[in-house]
Structure formats: C-alpha cells, structure tokens
C-alpha cells in the first residue's frame, strides 16, 4: 500500500447492490516542502487547496465496522485483476472534470446519495480526538498498528449509503372510517403505548442489517484529503464528461442588424395574402368557394347600387322637365 493511503468505508444496507466504484471530488492538503527556506526570506502565503477528482474502487466488504481495514485491502490488491486500469479516467476527462468542479461549492453536497459521517487518521495521537468519537478512533489506531504498517499512513472516511424513498405509483389510499374530521381536516389521534423494551424499540434498525464496503484508490495522490465535496457512483468514463446544455436561444451574427430594412425579420406578408392563407389552411377547399361567392356578392351589390343611382337620376330629370313645361 502506498503512503498517505485513503480508504472509504461505506455503510450499506444488506440486500442492496454496492457501487463498483465511487467518484470523489475533494480538496487535499499538500505535503510541506522538505527543503528549509532561509530565514531572511518571507514565507509564501498558503494557497487554497485545489479541487481534485479521484476514483475509488470496491475492494472488499466486511460485516462489522470494527473489522481491520488494511488486511482486506492488501488481500484484494494481491489478487490478480484483469481490468486493472479499466475504471481510471483519462487525462482529458480529468481536466474537464476539474474545470467543471471549480464552480462547485460546499452547498452542492445536498442531494447526494452518500453522506459523510466521520474521518479518521490512524495512529496520530498528537491530534485531539473529537468529542464523542474518541473510542472509535483509538480502536482504529490499535487495529491499524497491529497490521505492521507505520502509524499515520491511513486515512479512513466513514460514509453512509442512503436509500432513496421508493414510491409505488398508483397506490390507493384506503380511508379509515373511524377518522375524525373537523372542517374537512383530519384530527390527530394521540396514543400512549407502554413497553418495557424501551422507547422507540420497534423503529430501531439492527446493526446486523448493514455491511461495510471498502473502497481504495489505486494511484495514491500525495497529501491528506481535507474536504469532500461530493461522492457519487461511477461506472464508466463517459459519466465523467458533463452534459452540454443545449440553449434554445437563437444565435445571430454580429453584423446582423435587426433594424435594417433589408433584414429578413422585417419582411412581413401583405394582410390580404395572410388572411387568405390562414383561411385556406383552416377551411381547406371550402374557403375558396366561399371566398369566390362573397366576391361575386359584392360585385352584384355594387352593380345594383349603380343601377339604382342611375334610375334615381333619370327620375329626377323627368320630374324637372315636367315642372319646366308647366
């Protein structure tokens, strides 16, 4: 095992399928330079840790959290593996991932299926133990030291595999005839149950219902992991490439002036042709017959009006001549 080894220990419910590999976006603490700097030179300011992408492969599954980690990892690494580099991302994919993850903040851990529980670094007594978790960390330290590996070279992250709520579609809700309603609002029934087994015994989950999957990174990166931004399952290299967002906005050239008269956007059809085309599209062949009939009706009406005006004019002339003769 390489120095500064990081192992992911995922708590998974028994009966669910484990992920073959996990894609981990994290920040690492770079090791300090061995060469001492002169006293007259000012120390450089510490740089912000860069976001890195690492692939951890499933190497073993244990039934207890107290089981030693390193023997199982060593045994899995000693076995011959056919696809040793099958899940390792290419350099181009890694660069695209790093560029995409630079914009990710700590709040992006919200909807992940894997939740970080704790972090342990075996065999570091100088670091203060967190409150409430000192016993577990000391136990891990003794377990790792018995394996013969130097202290302080293993970092273990405990991760919980959370199951998604599976809702059955179309499930009918049976109404309870004894339900008490007040203004169409269901009232809450309070029931008191006394049990000698303790509070909430029926809702507790047995520890035997869970197993622990161990994930190991083949190519160790120098430096301890400081912050984990996201953990997600990873099966093939194509998943590392982010999907391109297809924008529905129209792209115009810079020389395309919308206010120019010759612009294609300002070519509007005539009102009559537009009305005819809409009517033809809506009514089909009946529109042409109806349209021609209405045109003939207008022409007939126009001729009738002209004839009526001419008749009125003739009558006026005759009446004027009759008056002049008198």
Curated annotation (Swiss-Prot):
Residue numbers spanned by region Disordered: 30-52, 120-147, 252-297, 307-326
UniProt xrefs under InterPro entries: SLC7A6OS (IPR040218), TF_Iwr1_dom (IPR013883)
Acidic residues bias locations: 269-279
GO cellular component entries: cytoplasm; nucleus
UniProt keyword annotations, A-Z: Cytoplasm, Nucleus, Protein transport, Transport
Matches recorded under Pfam families: Iwr1
Residue ranges with Basic and acidic residues bias: 136-147, 280-297
One GO-annotated biological process of the protein: developmental process
Main location (coarse class): cytoplasm
Cellular compartments annotated: Cytoplasm; Nucleus
Protein role: Directs RNA polymerase II nuclear import.
The family this protein is said to belong to: Belongs to the IWR1/SLC7A6OS family.
Name recorded for this polypeptide: Probable RNA polymerase II nuclear localization protein SLC7A6OS
Organism: Danio rerio (Zebrafish)
The encoding gene: slc7a6os
């Amino acid at each position: 095992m390489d120095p500064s080894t990081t192992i992911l220990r995922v708590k998974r419910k028994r009966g669910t399928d484990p992920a073959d590999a996990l894609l981990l976006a994290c920040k690492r603490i770079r090791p300090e330079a061995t060469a001492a700097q002169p006293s007259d030179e000012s120390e450089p300011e510490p740089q912000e840790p860069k976001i890195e992408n690492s692939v951890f492969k499933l190497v073993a599954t244990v039934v207890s959290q107290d089981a030693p980690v390193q023997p199982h990892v060593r045994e899995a690494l000693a076995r011959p593996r056919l696809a040793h580099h099958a899940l390792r991302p290419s350099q181009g994919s890694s660069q695209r991932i790093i560029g995409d993850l630079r914009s990710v903040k700590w709040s992006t851990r919200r909807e992940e299926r894997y939740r970080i529980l704790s972090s342990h670094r075996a065999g570091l007594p100088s670091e203060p133990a967190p409150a409430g978790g000192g016993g577990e960390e000391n136990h891990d330290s003794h377990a790792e030291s018995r394996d013969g590996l130097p202290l302080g070279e293993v970092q273990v992250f405990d991760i919980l595999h959370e199951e998604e709520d599976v809702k059955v579609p179309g499930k009918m809700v049976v109404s309870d005839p004894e339900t008490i309603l007040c203004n169409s609002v269901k009232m809450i029934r309070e029931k008191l149950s006394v049990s000698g087994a303790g509070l909430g015994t029926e809702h507790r989950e047995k520890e035997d219902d869970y197993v622990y999957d161990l994930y190991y990174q083949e190519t160790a990166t120098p430096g301890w992991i400081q912050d984990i931004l996201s953990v997600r399952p990873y099966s093939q290299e194509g998943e590392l490439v982010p999907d391109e967002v297809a924008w529905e906005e129209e792209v115009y050239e810079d020389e395309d002036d919308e206010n120019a008269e010759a612009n294609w956007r300002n070519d509007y059809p005539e009102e009559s042709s537009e009305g005819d085309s809409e009517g033809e599209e809506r009514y089909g062949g009946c529109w042409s017959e109806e349209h021609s009939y209405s045109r003939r009706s207008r022409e007939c009406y126009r001729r009738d009006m002209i004839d009526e005006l001419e008749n009125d004019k003739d009558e006026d002339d005759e009446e004027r001549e009759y008056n002049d003769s008198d």
